[in-house]
Amino acid sequence: MKPRILALSLVSALVSIAGCRNDSAVDSTLFAVEVMDGVRYVHNFKAQRGERPGARLELLGKIGTLEAKENKDILYDPVDAARLPDGDILILERGGSCVKRYDENHRLISAFGQKGQGPGDFANPFCLRLDRGRDRLYVGHSRVSRFTPDGIYEGGFNREVFAAFGSIGAESETSGMSVLSGARVILPSPPSIWLDSGADKLLSVYDDKGTLIRSFGAVKRYDDPGLMLNANIVKFAADADDNAYVAYAYQNRIDKYSPEGGMIFSADRPLRYEVRNVTKVEIFKSGAMEREFSWPSVSSVTKGISLDRKNRIWVLTFLKQPNRFLTFDEAENWTECLEFEVFDADGILLFKVALPDVPFGNFSIYDDRLYLVDWRHESCVYEYRIVEDN
């Protein structure tokens, strides 16, 4: 039996979505909605504010500098940042295998962690998250480890290693982590549970002991396993009600899932380029020997996702295609390479926010602060205030 598809008129889309949002300012001509099996598919044509920005980023300062002579002013390969309720800033170092804590004036307060495999140690950490109360922090590395803000280790569990697919598998494995209520976490699912079957299980929820609770996340299918893994790498975040927001790194797709793992909406938006994910044959030479390899060729769409205090979805979108290292050359102006697209909790594109011209690899949002983490160039973290435009 074919899925039942209900195409909503723009007027009824406005009534159904804006009505539940208690927001009468939505222009229904700027998006369309269709409903299939209870899931809303939102097609954004333009941002609600057009080309007018809805916010700007005000630089408050920078933590870490290459020219520093004292250890307190140096960050060793920072990869993530978070903000505690009192304004203190936590920065996760991959190179230093530790978490450093700074006050709101960017002065170092304390640090904890070391490289190793023991309880509270880190091995190639990539992600730092706070729980809903922001009184527990979780570090993603070869394990998931839970700490108090003062660095007291409270427990954790081992992660399944993504052994196959080389750099693609590594990118998928370290694409993110989200913390839910009840000390549960969302992690990328091991390819073994979805890749061969094509089951919709991109992400998995685990309890505090590492027991799998459930898996969810729509998979776009391809014939080549490497391409299917690559094209389905996702960035994700969770709100205070345990809804999960999933942005596909190499697809024009942003999904919202209920706490039970049911899809609520799937949204897209206009891009400046065509999304084309294919398998290409490349020739590798070593001396007189030549070998042909099939390798995925994908279009970069989304670099990251986060939620602000108004439960809006900030998606970091590529304006142009990056180099093979997923970054841009030094001569590039980053303002012209990436931008933030801000959606409401129903998938409607509200406005866009221009990036400052600084290179970075990761970002996070807490309260009215946005952190840009640069591990490749300046080894620093930039702190910005999000200033709303009326």
Annotate each PLM feature.
Residues M1-A7:
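Bacterial N-terminal signal peptides that target proteins for export
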Residues L8-S16:
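Bacterial N-terminal signal peptides
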Residues C20-N390:
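Eukaryotic scaffold repeat domains enriched in small/polar residues
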